[in-house]
Each structure stands twice: as C-alpha cells, then as structure tokens.
Amino acid sequence: MRGKIVVITGASSGIGQVAAEKLAGMGARLVLVARDKARGEAALARLREIAPAASHTIHYGDLSRLAEMKRVASEIAAAEPCIDVLINNAGALFGFRQVTEDGLELTFATNHISYFVLTQGLLKSLQAAAPSRVISTSSDAHKGLKLDFNDLQSANKYRGFPVYGRSKLANILFTSELARRLAGSGVTANCLHPGFVATRFGDQSGGFFSYVVRAAKVFAISPEKGAETIVYLASSDEVANVSGKYFYKCRQATPTRQAQDDEAAKRLWSETAKLAAVGMD
C-alpha cells in the first residue's frame, strides 16, 4: 500500500478509524471524511503519529445532506486527481423516522445515497489511478428484506432496524451495478459485512431502541476485528481482479437472493440518480 491514496468516510471512529490506521501503517496516504471536527482532528493526529511522513488530510461534511455530499466529493476530486481506494463506510441507524433538508429519509440518505454521490464525484480520480478499488461497508442486516420501490423513503411504515437493513441491501445492489458498469475499466467494486461491532453504531438511534443496541454490544466483536475485511479488500492482491462481490471475514460470502437481483440493482441505480439529482455514464 506504500504510496497509495485511500479516501475513507466514517473515519473518525469505529471500524473506519481502525481501517485508516491499519492502512496508514502499511504506507498508504489517507484522506479522511468526517462530520465531527473534534473526533476528526483526533483521528488525523493519530494517523500522523503512525505515519508522520505521509501528508494525511481530512475533509468535513454532513453526508446526509446532498449539498454536503457533492461539496466534499468536489473538494477531494480537486485535491486528489488520482485515488487508489475509496472506502464508503456509513452505518447510521435511527429509531425514529427523520427527513433531511432535501426531503430524504435520513437512514437511506446517509447509508446509501452518500455512497452513490461520493463514488460519482470521485470516479474520474479512481479511473485515473486504475487499477483502483471501491469498497462499501454493507451488513448481514440485509437478510430477510427486500426493497419497496414504491416506498424507498420508508414513509408508509418505519421501523429502525429493517430500514437500516434495507439501506445495507441497497449497498450490495449498488456494488453489483457499479461493478457491471465499470467492467473493463480497471476499477473494481466490492462490499462487505464487518460483523456486529462494538462501536458508536446505534448510539444516536434514540429512545428505547438506543438502549437495546447498547445492551447488545456485550456480544459484539472489537473494531479491530471488524475492520479486517475492509483492510483486506483495500490491500490484498487476492482480490485485485475481483469485482461485484460480497465479503465476510476476508472471504467471499453469498448475500440473499434479493441482493443478487440484477434488475433491482439497475432500478435502484436509476431511482437513486433521480433522488440525488446526478447521473453516471
């Protein structure tokens, strides 16, 4: 990874922070994306301790807001004409339905649309660095669920964990369609389930649901363990030519039938482009 440029979201805590530190230790230069400035500066300082010779940087933005997604992508693209690895790493879960200033359901905007918009905005830099990689953090929470294209915004019925699970299903379908569109370009796209990890995940979900999530963390794995598959997909030669796949514990895994629906993947792409008001050739 020496000299490689890695962009990673969700990098100021949890598995994103651990993955960034591991990759910095392997010689990569990290470009962090974070919302909280205090945690972001702490994460950046830690990277500079690990690899003081590398010019690690950070960009701040709220990736639930379309304008912020696009601004951050534009700023990074201008600063980084070549990007070797993009790691989309979002996993917010909310107990109550919330709507962003763009009229988007908050979970779907943060966990899925931000992946789409950031990848769109950084694609030229990824293509310029080919062979390069797009890695998206998904989850086994997608199991047993399917997308309702008549209600992608969960307006009719909202339950926190299924809404989260559908956003993670969207990550897998996004990865599949991205891989199809980028075939032969030198840019690969894969996604992963990190496991149930003891991080800040779910702390902001609200009410009784937040209590349940915190209580369940007694059974969770460490962020270090959860970050292993991210680091593997970013760095291993074993997956250099693998694209469109789902991984768990550094191995290919099989997602549900609903997550392997090519027509659903194409339709989700189209619907997401409309919601995000962007296109992708």
Could you describe each region identified by the protein language model?
Residues 20-24, 210, 251-255:
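A short small-residue
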